[in-house]
């Protein structure tokens, strides 16, 4: 029974990723086992950049002037003039057609973020200097505040993360990953890590996604990017790529900021800065997301 369920799980992942045979093989480095994202599939994905370093993090558009990303992407003292956001396109090239570079007006980091590795509150909002036109973007939907997230739900992570040679992906990568139970993730992170003995690693505002065997979903350069799930025919951002121990290591899945815990703060920040409520129009097309959720509810518990 266990092997049969696992076969179903692997087959579904191959269908969703275009039949790639390397979906569960670790070692490549970037979004491990991912594939090039089709044009227009993830229209909210942006690249956070500095003039000196180029691409440093991902992010997601939630409004015509607002980007959601990770707090650890920034350095203190905060200086918005150091940063720009590239909107549109699939590559990191600044000359790519249908893309634009927008200056950042303000940076809002969650007040309790500690500016240290694996800190809670790893979330930030960027206010763009110039509003985007409706033809330039499609915002991702945000979840309801404190919405529960079900382990086993298959979601998607995207980004231009680094390879093991520390090179960035030339084209935006996408990968389907299952959400993991937080207590299971906590136990995994303590395996082989004596320095973590007695310490709580996965905080209540974090969630894990990836593969127990070591097939990590994201790597350096993916930070700040979105983890989205197809829920009620819409793409909902449930996580922000935050941290992990290495890339593609067994028992060290990707850790994400749990977006439902911060929806109230996001709404309050937008309201305090005279922005109307965000609105999304990102429909999850195709039958695969719904099919995957139905079948994985049966197959995944025995396969992982």
UniProtKB/Swiss-Prot annotation:
Q: Say which enzyme class the record assigns.
A: hydrolase
State one Pfam family annotation. Answer: Trypsin
Question: What name does UniProt use for this protein?
Answer: Serine protease 30
Instruction: Name the organs or tissues of expression.
Output: Expressed predominantly in kidney, small intestine and stomach and moderately in thymus, lung, spleen, testis and skin. In the kidney, expressed mainly in collecting duct of renal medulla and cortex.
Which Cys pairs are S-S linked? 57-73, 155-229, 185-208, 219-247
- Write out the GO biological process terms: proteolysis; sodium ion transport
Extract the Gene3D superfamilies matched here: Trypsin-like serine proteases (2.40.10.10)
Q: What Gene Ontology molecular-function terms does this entry list?
A: serine-type endopeptidase activity; sodium channel regulator activity
Spell out the PANTHER family in the cross-references.
SERINE PROTEASE HEPSIN, TRANSMEMBRANE PROTEASE SERINE
Q: How is its activity regulated?
A: Inhibited by aprotinin, leupeptin, benzamidine and soybean trypsin inhibitor. Partially inhibited by PMSF and DFP.
Q: Write out the propeptide range(s).
A: 22-30, 276-304
User: What is the membrane topology listed in the Swiss-Prot or TrEMBL record?
Assistant: Lipid-anchor; GPI-anchor
Record EC number:
3.4.21.-
Which family does the record assign? Answer: Belongs to the peptidase S1 family.
Query: Its biological function?
Result: Selectively cleaves synthetic peptide substrates of trypsin. Activates the epithelial sodium channel ENaC.
Top-level taxon of origin: Eukaryota
* Keyword annotations from UniProtKB, A to Z: Cell membrane, Disulfide bond, Glycoprotein, GPI-anchor, Hydrolase, Ion transport, Lipoprotein, Membrane, Protease, Serine protease, Signal, Sodium, Sodium transport, Transport, Zymogen
- Lineage per the UniProt record: Eukaryota, Metazoa, Chordata, Craniata, Vertebrata
Q: Assign the protein's first listed, main location to one coarse class.
A: membrane
- Residue limits of the Peptidase S1 domain? 31-271
Q: Where are the transmembrane segments?
A: none
